């Protein structure tokens, strides 16, 4: 049986388009386990706002037994953050979330828990402050 690669996606600033983009993952038939390293509540809120009827489930990047996601499902490694997202308004309060998402994906790749990572748009001015 062929191993299915595990790809970690970091969607970037939660007020930006990256969270919208990852909500379209279920439309594609990727031959990989796709995991989004993000805040699951922010992602669920965005799905509701965009009227996306998809399942969003919490998983661990470090689960070696993870199988390809179910149809119409997004797997999320939850990065905990409290706060509010105003779409289109980057907020320096989200910088720790963005950096933690990147660090989590990098560590998973370096530790051989993931085969690749893909980054969404990062608001550099927000994380520089």
Question: How does the language model describe each region?
Answer:
Residues 1-129:
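Contiguous, glycine/small-aliphatic-enriched amphipathic segments in soluble metabolic enzymes
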């Amino acid at each position: 049986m062929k191993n299915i690669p595990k790809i970690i996606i970091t969607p970037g600033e939660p007020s930006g388009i990256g969270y919208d983009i990852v909500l379209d993952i279920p439309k594609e038939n990727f031959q990989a386990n796709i995991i989004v390293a993000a805040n699951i509540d922010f992602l669920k809120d965005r799905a509701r706002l965009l009227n996306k009827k998809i399942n969003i489930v919490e998983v661990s990047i470090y689960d070696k037994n993870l199988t390809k996601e179910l149809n119409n499902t997004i797997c999320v490694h939850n990065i905990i953050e409290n706060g509010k997202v105003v779409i289109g308004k980057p907020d320096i309060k989200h910088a720790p979330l963005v950096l933690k998402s990147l660090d989590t994906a990098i560590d998973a790749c370096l530790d051989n828990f993931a085969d690749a990572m893909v980054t969404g748009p990062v608001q550099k001015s927000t994380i520089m402050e």
